[in-house]
């Protein structure tokens, strides 16, 4: 994958750090276990949770770290206005502007819920010229459902 760190550089740094550890150098005799890896954000995940009354959008990197959260309530829509299309469009535009600021060009969309705001969010992302790689729908669908009531006989 293009967004992962080059393994060769990391292994060289790891060997350098272990040499310092063996010689009891600058690191106060503690083993070096955690190293921050740099990666470029080329692909990000957009989680859309749409209920009947609100739409929540969160942007994460490929490791699952949340970069930005938006909802219709955070865009100053309160009460019954949160379920409108305009509110979910405004939240999506805020996410898209953050993506352009961070130079994120490709998105993977993951949908949760049956609300109508998710359709508007996807439409807004397409309008703003970000490339959508995949759309995954993760709903809990009942395949047979609960047992129905006994039929009434007259």
From Swiss-Prot:
Q: Would I find Ribonucleoprotein among this entry's keywords?
A: yes
Q: Where in the cell is it found?
A: Plastid
Name the coiled-coil region(s).
Answer: none
List GO BP terms, alphabetically. translation
Pfam families in the cross-refs: Ribosomal_S11
Please give one Gene Ontology molecular function term for this protein: rRNA binding
**Which InterPro entries would you find in this protein's record?**
Ribosomal_uS11, Ribosomal_uS11_sf
Per its UniProt record, what Gene3D superfamilies does this chain match? Ribosomal protein S11
Question: For this UniProt entry, what's an example GO CC term?
Answer: ribonucleoprotein complex
Keyword annotations for this protein, in alphabetical order, are:
Plastid, Ribonucleoprotein, Ribosomal protein, RNA-binding, rRNA-binding
Q: How does it assemble?
A: Part of the 30S ribosomal subunit.
Which HAMAP family would you find in this protein's record?
A: Ribosomal_uS11 (MF_01310)
- Give the family per the record: Belongs to the universal ribosomal protein uS11 family.
What protein name applies here? Small ribosomal subunit protein uS11c
Q: Which gene encodes it?
A: rps11
């Amino acid at each position: 994958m293009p967004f992962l760190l080059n393994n060769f550089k990391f292994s060289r740094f790891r060997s350098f750090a272990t040499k310092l550890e063996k010689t009891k150098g600058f690191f106060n005799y503690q083993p070096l276990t955690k190293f921050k890896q740099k990666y470029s954000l080329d692909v990000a995940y957009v989680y859309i949770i749409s209920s009947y009354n609100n739409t929540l959008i969160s942007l994460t990197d490929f490791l699952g770290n949340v970069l930005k959260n938006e909802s219709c309530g955070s865009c100053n829509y309160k009460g019954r206005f949160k379920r409108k299309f305009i509110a979910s469009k405004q939240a999506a535009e805020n996410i898209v502007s953050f993506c352009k600021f961070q130079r994120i060009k490709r998105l993977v969309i993951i949908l949760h819920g049956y609300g109508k705001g998710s359709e508007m969010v996807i439409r807004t992302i397409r309008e703003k010229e970000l490339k959508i790689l995949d759309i995954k729908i993760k709903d809990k669908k009942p395949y047979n459902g609960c047992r129905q009531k006994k039929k009434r006989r007259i």
